[in-house]
Amino acid sequence: SEEKQLVKYFKTVIEPKLKEKDLEYYLIRNERIPELAIYSFSAGERFEPDFLLFIKKKNVSEIKSLQAYIEPKGSQLLLQDAWKEKFLSQIKDEHQITDLLGHGYTILGLPFFNQENRMNEFSKAIDELVNQL
């Protein structure tokens, strides 16, 4: 499944990049937890991305943290769920953090993880994400 492939990709490609930069990180599988649902900006459609990736810089005086939504998607569902990928791409620019802890905290969505059709986009997004920390 795409979910298993994502975990393998994380262990072999993403994790070494995070370790190289000495970043603290957690990849969390969202098992249909209602509190982790997000809603599209345009129509309020409910969406529960399969994975959340939390990354934090260690040992810095200024806290810099990042939360990324990751959605593995089988090729047969790419067109049907295109609205979800569009929504994920809007999160970084559209989100608003209203908590006092929001300073230095970034939320974003990544392109769908799909080994057949989306690896270039996904890999590029991961590299950009890691490089900004």
Name each region found by the language model.
Residues 1-133:
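Electrostatic, structured charged patches in enzyme active sites and in nucleic-acid/phosphate-binding
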